[in-house]
UniProtKB/Swiss-Prot annotation:
Name of the molecule in the record: Citrate synthase 1, peroxisomal
Pfam families noted in UniProt: Citrate_synt (PF00285)
InterPro entries: Citrate_synth-like_lrg_a-sub (IPR016142), Citrate_synth-like_sm_a-sub (IPR016143), Citrate_synthase (IPR002020), Citrate_synthase_AS (IPR019810), Citrate_synthase_bac-typ (IPR024176), Citrate_synthase_sf (IPR036969)
Native source species: Arabidopsis thaliana (Mouse-ear cress)
Intracellular or extracellular location(s): Peroxisome
Catalytic activity, reaction form: oxaloacetate + acetyl-CoA + H2O = citrate + CoA + H(+)
Organism lineage string: Eukaryota, Viridiplantae, Streptophyta, Embryophyta, Tracheophyta
Length: 480
């Protein structure tokens, strides 16, 4: 995209925003976090070789190739069979605990060591030094942008932040008690109606072969997502939508739309805007999680990007995914006071209550994002005052980490534990994790379009139903 005069005029602002060492910098006074940057080589050496399998049912031996990444192709196991009526081995993997449907270069996780990197960069380092819009560029295009690229990128997102009036009218027609993320799912899906020229179902599969068409949809989604989310939030508050301002950063604009009530002179607190920016960075991408897998699954059919993204948002809406942030707040509210923690701990150990905000399917160590969020929480509470639930949260964390039951199960605080308290203090729905995660969905969508291995996702099943049966009339069935 060509740089504009308006974009050049913003470079000075961007320079100030990205420089963290200036004495008058408005970024939170948070110490640099310990990062996982000590490993600069590839995560592991080549694991390429062959796997020898002996089928004790038949005595047959098989050689299965192992890739340099330590994976085998499941179709190679189909040749392991007991005879002509056996169609070969199939893998049963509920929840995809050990199945990789894609190869990706976007993010790397080592759950045992508590490592998360975006395109090789430790997430803690990006949270300390970068901005959300810069990270979105990194995730989508693979490298950090130059100063000029960043200015163009932010300008393009800003220029595409206005939402079609028809979408805003749709949000306004929703019930007053609509959940903001439910509204976000509906509105994001509806965008495909307003951009038919970029819909493969209407224009043919080749429409996304154009990188210009792809890039246009990416900046549209990134630009409009916070505008839609803010409109959904305001709808629940009984207020009309607020249009974004072109002179504010991504996170500042989100706070402006949520807080200003249309007062164009309103200025969001820059320290809180930076906190939100860091939260967005931490939640932007997390490899093949449920919602990202849902987005890639939908895009594999050749559908439009808006449907794929709305599907991802719908998945993160679930209480076991992004909804866990709200569940954590509800849990702390139910506990109420520090004095009730021992009783709560015992009820969890007796499987009568659920401990939200602890543990993770991937991380068997501290969630690296959780450490950053805890420091952010202190910053927010120094500005807005300390939420009484923070005392409950601190005490619950100490109690859980000193109890052998939780330590043995490696149940450490995750990113949800304190981010919910931050959102609550700032008056932002915890469920709006979805806004930041859209960058990850778009990165995977773009990557899948260029991956020659991309196929329409069509998992197998293990059939456990009845054998063949033949139809009988109602009268015949009644006789039985």
């Amino acid at each position: 995209m060509e740089i504009s005069e308006r974009a050049r005029a913003r470079l000075a602002v961007l320079n100030a925003h990205l420089t963290v060492s200036e004495p008058n910098q408005v970024l939170p006074a948070i110490e640099p976090w310990c990062t996982s940057a000590h490993i600069t080589a590839a995560p592991h050496g080549s694991l390429k070789g062959n796997l020898k399998i002996v089928d004790e049912r038949t005595g047959n031996e098989y050689q299965v190739p192992v890739s340099e990444h330590g994976t085998v192709k499941t179709v190679d196991l189909k040749k392991i069979t007991t005879g002509k009526d056996d169609k070969g081995l199939n893998l049963y993997d509920p929840g995809y605990l050990n199945t990789a449907p894609v190869r990706s270069s976007i993010s790397y996780i080592d759950g045992d060591e508590g490592i998360l990197r975006y395109r090789g960069y430790p997430v803690e380092e990006l949270a300390e030094k970068s901005t959300y819009t810069e990270v979105t560029y990194l995730l989508i295009y693979g490298n950090l942008p130059s100063q000029r690229q960043l200015a163009d990128w932010e300008f393009a997102i800003s220029q595409n932040s206005a939402v079609p009036q028809g979408v805003l009218d749709m949000i306004q027609s929703m019930p007053n008690d609509v959940h903001p993320v439910g509204a976000l799912v509906t509105a994001m899906s509806a965008l495909s109606i307003f951009y038919p020229d970029a819909n493969p179902s209407l224009m043919g599969l080749g429409v996304y072969k154009s990188k210009q068409v792809r890039d246009k949809q990416i900046v549209r989604v990134l630009g409009q997502a916070p505008t839609i989310a803010a409109a959904a939030y305001l709808r629940k508050a009984g207020k009309p939508p607020v249009q974004p301002l072109s002179n504010l950063s991504y996170s500042e604009n989100f706070l402006y739309m949520v807080e200003s009530m249309g007062d164009r002179s309103y200025k969001p607190n820059p320290r809180l805007a930076r906190v939100l920016d860091i939260l967005f960075i931490l939640q932007a991408e997390h490899e093949m999680n449920c919602s990202t897998a849902a987005a890639r699954h939908l895009s594999s059919s050749g559908g439009d990007v808006y449907t794929a993204v709305s599907g991802g948002v719908g998945a993160i809406y679930g209480p076991l995914h992004g909804g866990a942030v709200e569940a954590t707040i509800n849990m702390l509210s139910e506990i109420g006071t520090v004095e009730n923690i021992p009783e709560f701990i015992e009820s969890v150990k007796n499987k009568k209550r659920r401990l939200s905000g602890f543990g993770h399917r991937i991380y068997k160590n501290y969630d690296p994002r959780g450490k950053v969020v805890k420091k952010l929480a202190d910053e927010v509470f120094s500005i807005l005052g300390r939420d009484p639930l923070v005392e409950v949260g601190d005490a619950l964390e100490k109690a859980a980490l000193s109890d052998e039951y939780f330590v043995k199960r490696k149940l450490y605080p995750n990113v949800d534990f304190y981010s919910g308290l931050i959102n609550r203090a700032m008056g932002i729905p915890s469920s709006f994790t979805a806004v930041s995660r859209i960058a990850g969905y778009l990165s995977h969508w773009r990557e899948s379009l260029d991956d020659p291995d991309t196929k329409i996702m069509r998992p197998q099943q293990v059939y456990t139903g009845a054998g063949i049966r033949h139809y009988e009339t109602v009268r015949e069935r009644t006789k039985l």
